[in-house]
Amino acid sequence: MAVPKQKSSKSRGRKRRTHQKVAAPTLTVCPECQEAKLPHAACPACGAYRNRNVRPDAVEA
């Protein structure tokens, strides 16, 4: 197993970790009810997907 020869400094370790971040989710606007929703997914508010209601239990907007 590999063992480090030198102790890595705090700044070096933190520089390496700058790329490990969580990206914010991409949101789009539902064309039916104008609510924010994830792309390629049914709207959680009205249940519309590609101009059709795919959730019969959703309230009509």
Curated annotation (Swiss-Prot):
The keyword Glycoprotein is assigned to this record: no
Feature: compositional bias, Basic residues: 7-20
Keyword Transmembrane helix in record: no
MF (Gene Ontology): structural constituent of ribosome
Keywords noted in UniProt: Ribonucleoprotein, Ribosomal protein
SUPFAM superfamilies given in the database record: Zn-binding ribosomal proteins
Pfam short name (any one): Ribosomal_L32p
GO biological process: translation
Region (Disordered): 1-22
Gene Ontology terms: cellular component: large ribosomal subunit
Family: Belongs to the bacterial ribosomal protein bL32 family.
Protein name (Swiss-Prot/TrEMBL): Large ribosomal subunit protein bL32
Organism: Desulforapulum autotrophicum (strain ATCC 43914 / DSM 3382 / VKM B-1955 / HRM2)
Gene name of the record: rpmF
